[in-house]
From Swiss-Prot:
Belongs to the inorganic carbon transporter (TC 9.A.2) DabA family. Its main location: membrane. The gene is dabA1. Its cofactor is Zn(2+). PANTHER family: INORGANIC CARBON TRANSPORTER SUBUNIT DABA-RELATED, UPF0753 PROTEIN AQ_863. This is Probable inorganic carbon transporter subunit DabA 1. It is a peripheral membrane protein. It comes from the Bacteria. InterPro entries: DabA. Signal peptide: none annotated. It is found in: Cell inner membrane.
Length: 844
């Protein structure tokens, strides 16, 4: 094709119908579904960054990201080469990986040669280019500010002001409008683009339709996007501003959970495309038109993502990654299959003195093992840390609270905070004082940061903060008060507890009635496989973390509690299960809790491994010695757990581990107060006897499950559709943040700046960052997290899991498309088989 013909092809391309074109709307909806949501910092939870791609295979997704998003979801070739050289990938793993990807057409030795060769830089055979990208290519080598970067900065600046949740001193004047309309209103006065050489920017935006969908359709037509490339072009545009797209998707996700519809992401897509359209209109030169026509011609020849031979370098890397995972999986399977269970079972009495239920979080695996060492007679249990109580917990002085349940669920009940043993007068006094202190703190902050008073404030009051800076630096005080106790006197904070009695708050019903309590208690106990015998003390230990100066602090708290600590859920569950009327109701349902059994709510601090037991004064006097023994054993277990974690934390002096770990939790310069869930690679749903005594290194989610107690496999279905999926989200967030932190992580923690109280920027500009900081997966010299997809092991009949996968297409997609590796555990874990697809199981 001649250059003239190429230039003319922009107008010759068949136009895509705009406002009434159902196909366009399908493309928009489909593109928006590709974006994974990003929860705000106040309840930051792990999300699978590939959530919108689980309907296709892992390999196809790798090809899609290279071709459409122009980024990788695998490690660099050098990583696999090093693993080969270190012996972490053996020939057997390579051969198995080649069997999975036969289209690569290589033998083991050929693959090793390819791995050790320097991969030639290559691009996929057909890509989806954007206007800004084409313009940047044309300007390569010039002293030139990237238009892609400029566009992202400008959109990010608008979003930061528009979505602000209270950080900005001056709220956006267009907040009342929808995003697209608000942006167009501001764009009419914005001269920044024209200063950058984008002539006619404001006119180009003004001529676009006011409706975002119509604007998208018009832009697609004017740009001449081939019909088969429309959806990919929209996906590419959304991933150009992936962080803000993810936050907009969160807004939509929240609306969908409440049965509503929200088009914030569509509006943001229109803004992004409008920028491209303005760039397109500003360039009328032949060089650009020819380059754009070539890009559209290439986009019209999009390949099938399944044809990995179109991208041979990617195919080699996929096989190498598969082999890397197989080698790690084989080691894990060998350890599980070779672990004896008889001795562990024999040590447990028929009625253990203590049963301690912990969250399935991988950090609990270390503590459970430590507690079983310190207290061999104790039985530990693994269950999602919300303990089956999906509540919205409303602190004193608030009208709304946080969702204390997995983000896949919607809170079913509202529980308000109250002061124990306080009458109505004292409750009102506490509420009024807290509100007064918060208003005063807000006014003081406004005075400190306002444009007029900030300079005089530093001059007159700066020295007064010297002592505070010193004590904060020494870890004696916190730079910012904990929101849990902010505005409360210490003696009042110690008396705060959840109020279970039915009530009303702002027109909403709060608390539980007796029928609801019995139903929730029954469901929780059955899901934990805890229906008897019951110990004298049953500990329900939620978990949270203690850090300072950490924007992602909630990401270290309990994901099953929606990015909050598990304290509220543990205390609510314990209070319900101690209720005599609830026990009467449970007895009628076949669950008999003895009179001498008491449930305790507790909180495991994953940063320090300290365990706090709540409501001790309610424990019957007859159990005082039992409680004292339990607390002593918990303290022993904490020391053992800290000692085990000290190596990874880089604490060389074993005699000073306790002090060093606690100091990290108070150090505002510490970028790695703990390792979170780094290293996670397995999810095991089985009786504890399958794994008791086995050191899994804090890498496995452990969920207690006894198939023989599960009538109709209802609990199994709950496990596979909720905890297993949440573990998959966590695993793939760590995976993405490791393989490509620039795209799926949040970069360097040291450079983070909070924006709008909802997320972080790396530096003072650029896109909103998603995922985990680099310091969460890397210790400065090596990776701490191994990028491995989740290996799931369930002690249940394969036929039952097959039926669940047939009923649950989302779970089936995860298994069949290789996002999790599902295995069955038979014969006490000595027989392990992997699921290829429902009904097809092979030897692992």
């Amino acid at each position: 094709m001649t250059q003239a013909a190429l230039a003319m092809s922009i107008t010759a391309t068949d136009p895509v119908d705009t406002a009434t074109d159902a196909r366009l709307k399908e493309c928009i909806d489909s593109a928006c579904q590709r974006v994974a949501p990003l929860w705000p910092l106040k309840h930051f939870v792990a999300v699978n960054p590939f959530l919108g791609f689980t309907g296709q295979s892992f390999a196809a997704t790798a090809a899609t990201f290279e071709r459409v998003v122009r980024t990788r979801i695998l490690m660099p070739r050098a990583f696999y080469r090093q693993a080969l050289d270190d012996g972490r990938i053996d020939d057997a793993a390579l051969a198995r990986a080649l069997d999975i990807h036969p289209s690569v057409g290589l033998g083991v030795e050929q693959l090793k040669q390819q791995a050790r060769a320097t991969a030639a830089p290559s691009s996929p055979p057909a890509v989806v280019a954007t206007v800004a990208e084409v313009l940047d290519r044309l300007a390569e080598g010039d002293r030139y500010v990237s238009l892609v970067a400029f566009m992202i900065d400008e959109i990010s600046a608008f979003c930061a002001g528009y979505f602000d949740e209270g950080q900005a001193s001056w709220p956006s004047p267009v907040r009342s409008l929808k995003p697209y309309a608000a942006w167009r209103r501001l764009a009419a006065y914005d001269r920044n683009p024209e200063v950058m050489g984008l002539t006619g920017f404001r006119n180009a935006i003004a001529e676009l339709p006011a409706d975002p969908v119509q604007a998208i359709g018009l832009i697609i037509t004017r740009l001449g996007i081939p019909e088969r490339a429309v959806e990919d072009y929209l996906v590419r545009a959304l991933f150009d501003i992936g962080g803000w797209s993810a936050y907009a998707r969160y807004i939509g996700w929240s609306a969908e959970r409440d049965g509503q519809r929200d088009d914030t992401l569509v509006e943001l897509l229109a803004i992004r495309l409008a920028w491209g359209y303005a760039l397109f209109q500003a360039r009328t030169d032949a060089a650009f038109k020819i380059a754009w026509a070539q890009a559209m011609e290439e986009a019209a020849k999009l390949p099938d993502d399944q044809r990995l031979d179109d991208t041979p370098e990617l195919a080699v890397d996929l096989v190498l990654h598969e082999a890397y995972e197989i080698a790690i999986r084989n080691q894990l399977i060998a350890r599980l299959a070779g672990h004896g269970t008889g001795a562990a079972v024999a040590r447990l009495p028929a009625r253990p003195p203590v049963q301690a239920a912990f969250c399935i979080d991988v950090r609990s695996e270390i503590f459970r093992r430590a507690l079983e060492t310190a207290y061999p007679e104790a039985e530990t249990i693994g269950f999602a840390g919300f303990f089956g109580f999906p509540i919205e917990y409303v602190p004193i002085g608030h009208t709304r609270g946080g969702a204390q349940c997995p983000v896949l669920l919607k809170p079913a009940f509202i529980v308000c905070e109250a002061v124990k043993d306080a009458d109505d007068v004292e409750q009102a006094e506490v509420l009024g004082l807290r509100l007064l202190r918060r208003r005063a703190a807000k006014a003081w902050k406004s005075f400190k940061v306002s444009a007029v008073s900030s300079f005089s404030f530093v001059e007159t009051a700066g020295l007064g903060f010297a002592a505070k800076i010193a004590t904060d630096s020494a870890g004696v005080t916190r730079p910012v008060p904990s929101p849990v106790v902010d505005g409360l006197d210490p003696e009042i904070a110690a008396r705060v507890m959840p109020r279970l009695a039915p009530g009303e708050l702002g027109g909403r019903v709060t608390g539980f009635n007796d029928v609801q309590r019995v139903a929730m208690a029954e469901a929780a106990l059955k899901a934990m496989s805890l229906t008897g015998p019951f110990a004298r003390l049953v500990l329900l230990a939620g978990h949270g973390s203690t850090t300072v100066n950490n924007p992602h602090a909630s990401g270290l708290d309990c994901g099953a509690c929606g990015g909050h600590t598990g304290e509220a859920n543990a205390r609510v569950a314990a209070a319900v299960l101690n209720d005599p009327r609830v026990r009467d109701g449970l007895r009628a349902k076949g669950i008999d809790i003895p009179a001498d059994c008491w449930f305790l709510g507790a909180l495991h601090d994953t940063t320090t491994d300290a365990v706090t037991v709540f409501d001790e004064d309610d424990v019957p006097a007859a159990l005082a010695q039992d409680l004292a023994r339990l607390k002593a054993r918990l303290a022993d277990a904490a020391r053992l757990a800290r000692l085990e974690r000290s190596a990874l934390l880089g604490i060389p002096d074993k005699s000073a581990v306790d002090a060093a770990v606690i100091a990290r939790s108070r150090d505002w310069s510490q970028v790695r107060p703990e390792w979170g869930l780094a290293g996670n690679c397995a999810f095991i749903a089985a009786p504890r006897s399958f794994t008791r005594g086995l050191d899994l290194g804090g890498r496995a989610f452990l969920h207690s499950y006894e198939a023989e107690r599960d009538d109709g496999h209802r609990t199994l279905e709950l496990i596979m559709t909720a905890p297993m999926v949440v573990a998959n989200w966590i695993n793939l967030q760590y995976f993405g943040s490791t393989v490509n932190n620039a795209a799926f992580g949040s970069g360097n923690k040291v450079l983070h700046n909070i924006v709008g109280q909802l997320g972080v920027l790396e530096g003072n500009a650029g896109d909103l960052r998603v995922g985990l900081p680099w310091q969460s997966v890397h210790d400065g010299t090596r990776l701490v997290h191994e990028p491995v997809r989740l290996n799931v092991f369930i002690a249940a009949p394969e036929s039952a899991m097959d039926e669940i996968m047939q009923r649950q297409p989302g779970v089936r997609d995860l298994v069949v498309n290789g996002w999790v590796m599902l295995h069955s555990l038979g014969d006490h874990g000595t027989t392990i088989r992997r699921c290829v697809s429902p009904g097809v199981w092979i030897a692992a």
